[in-house]
Amino acid sequence: MILLVQLMLGVALAASAGLRAWLPLFVVGLLARTGQIDLNASFDFLSRTDALIVFGVATVLEFLGDKIVVVDHFLDSLGTFIRPVAGTLLASSMLTVTEPVTATVVGIVTGGGTALTVHAGKMLTRIKATAALPLHGGTANAALSLSEDFVVGTWLWIAMVSPWVAFLLALVALAVAVWLIMALWRSGKHLLAVLTGARKNEPRSIDLK
């Protein structure tokens, strides 16, 4: 039962990392530093002073940068590599009753995969918001960013209070992200088919020379 709860908590934290890479790491590191939670011994470095300073500064920079047009898209692109790593660290560090190697492998599969999927859904939401409101894309993205800040903060609190509920929220986030990815894939295939068909139907010029 303990392992199941730790797995669910790890997935929930990883899902939140799909929206914000650094805040979950900072919160988990701080809670571990103050003795509120335990980490897998191999991941105790998350609660070191230097790690907390890096996580704290990065959290502030991510919070501010995500509200600025162009910078937010750059951070999302960078997050494609950072957030899965953050998700892996969070999920692995929660598995205190398993060996470090096992915890790392499980963390990569559950945490890294979850964070990457949620991150992809977030990126697609931002793209759709910019495309739907080209003149107000920056405002729309800033509003979405603030809502994500609220969601992640609330999510982290719920995860510490009730891992079961946080895990269910993670499943919902994963379902929405997968739906967005599939919707974009279908629309992309449809657009490609339309463009290909249009080119095939283009009248060819006849050379009379």
Residue ranges with predicted function:
Residues M1-V5, L31-T49, A91-G107, A159-F167:
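Helix-coil boundary and interhelical linker segments in multi-pass alpha-helical membrane proteins
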Residues A12, L89-M94, K122-T130, S145, ...:
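Generic transmembrane alpha-helix signature in multi-pass membrane proteins
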Residues F55-G65, G111-K122, W179-M182:
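Alpha-helical transmembrane segments of multi-pass membrane proteins
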Residues V60-H73, L124-A132:
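C-terminal ends of transmembrane helices
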Residues H73-V85, I108:
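Cytoplasmic-side transmembrane-helix entry/capping segments in multi-pass membrane proteins
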Residues T80-S92, G138-T154, K200-L208:
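Small-residue-rich segments of transmembrane alpha-helices in multi-pass membrane proteins
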Residues V85-T96, A103-T125, F150:
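Mid-bilayer segments of alpha-helical transmembrane spans in multi-pass integral membrane proteins
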Residues V105-V109, A129-L144:
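The feature identifies polytopic integral membrane transport proteins across all domains of life
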